[in-house]
Amino acid sequence: MVGFSGDTIAAIATAIVPQQGSVGIVRLSGAAATEIARQIFQIAGQQPWESHRILYGYIRDPESGRLVDEALLLPMLAPRSYTREDVVELHCHGGLMPVQQTLQLCIRAGARLAEPGEFTLRAFLNGRLDLSQAESIADLISAQSPQAAQAALGSLQGKLGHPIRQLRDRCLDILAEVEARIDFEDDLPPLDLEAIAAQLTAAGADMQAILSTADRGELLRTGLKIAIVGRPNVGKSSLLNAWSRCDRAIVTDLPGRTRDLVESQLIVGGIPVQVLDTAGIRETSDQVEQIGVERSRRAAQSADLVLLTIDASAGWSAEDQTIWEAVSDRPILLVINKRDRLSEAERHAIALPQQEFKAIVWTAAAQQKGIEDLEAAILAAVGTGDLTSANWDWALNQRQVAALTTAQTALRRVEETLQAQLPLDFWTIDLREAIAALGSITGEGIAESMLDLIFSRFCIGK
């Protein structure tokens, strides 16, 4: 896909929801975008065709004259467009037929169906975005919390790319000094080794400061999966309902009513959280319930955090011990539910298990009590605290973390080379590795195969 030949591409830029979408957009980009649009769009009246001016009219099949849709057209001529090429958007009525027929007309008129992420790839190749900005667009589209969106917008505005380019420039400056001494050793004064050591230390510290945000950034981007597990009738479904503030799960006094996983999407301290209410885990002869129990075990094994829920009035039982043993390889937070059934004195007297838990939280889910304590314990367990009050300028992805780690490791080797007083040729090897790794974050010198992989993860039309 990389290295396009200047052809004109087209794609549907909005989600296709059959019979529900109010507006659908077909996007064109390339040298022939305006010509193709003129072939299929009939302007109503005497409206002037100007860049960034919306036109009203009709989409017609140029061969048969058949009316396809009543629409708006927005031309955005180069370089003032998303791709820095001529871009035309056709705003149709939503639903399947109008946008699909309009797209087919564009292709018949000479456009090519865009590949995933090709509009953003062209924006990158034409210099409108660096690679970190391009990746942030996909993050913004998939953001599941306001904080994740804020981080994506910060990166889109260059708040990650700018410090990365500064780090790369500093490494280039050091490399230039070193190579100058290699080529013109007799004509230049010796290197100021103390100054270079200080520069390397400062650059490494700046890299570490960026890397220190990686774990929290990953949580913002991908979120947490939490499984509520426990024996039947301890209040797992009530806990989910209280937490999600709606009746997501059926609650009865009869044990074993939850047979399948019930899922709820929440935001806890700025982190997207997928909560799974599982079937009560116990030995049972009911075949359907057995399936639910097995799904519960699998859900717990795949969760980032397990909420092992017990009944305060029953205390820690042998069944609870068995469940704990089944999930003990996962981080576990103990939730003691139905605290309202015990007096204060009885709560202090209850025999708590000796196992290690991330935290122990008392709740009364039926009365919606203890939820704030539960959320605080979860944030403490994952080591983030509340992220809603922080200003997020970026959220590193795994590729960026790997590149920064490579650069940091290479700079450490340069420091070791300096301390060992090895020849300058050894310096250049590691400096070049650091420069290449930093450049890969913003897209400088990155391999075409890597670009294809990155942009293939985008949706078609973006």
Curated annotation (Swiss-Prot):
Residues that bind GTP: 233-238, 252-258, 277-280
GO terms of biological process kind: tRNA methylation; tRNA wobble uridine modification
Binding site for (6S)-5-formyl-5,6,7,8-tetrahydrofolate: 27, 89, 128, 462
Keyword field: Cytoplasm, GTP-binding, Hydrolase, Magnesium, Metal-binding, Nucleotide-binding, Potassium, tRNA processing
GO molecular function, one term: metal ion binding
EC numbers, comma separated: 3.6.-.-
Main subcellular location: cytoplasm
InterPro entries named in the record: G_TrmE (IPR031168), GTP-bd (IPR006073), GTP-bd_TrmE_N (IPR018948), GTPase_MnmE (IPR004520), MnmE_dom2 (IPR027368), MnmE_helical (IPR025867), P-loop_NTPase (IPR027417), Small_GTP-bd (IPR005225)
Residue numbers binding Mg(2+): 237, 258
PROSITE patterns: G_TRME
General function of this protein: Exhibits a very high intrinsic GTPase hydrolysis rate. Involved in the addition of a carboxymethylaminomethyl (cmnm) group at the wobble position (U34) of certain tRNAs, forming tRNA-cmnm(5)s(2)U34.
Family according to the record: Belongs to the TRAFAC class TrmE-Era-EngA-EngB-Septin-like GTPase superfamily. TrmE GTPase family.
PANTHER family: TRNA MODIFICATION GTPASE GTPBP3, TRNA MODIFICATION GTPASE GTPBP3, MITOCHONDRIAL
UniProt name for this protein: tRNA modification GTPase MnmE
Organism whose genome encodes this protein: Synechococcus sp. (strain ATCC 27144 / PCC 6301 / SAUG 1402/1)
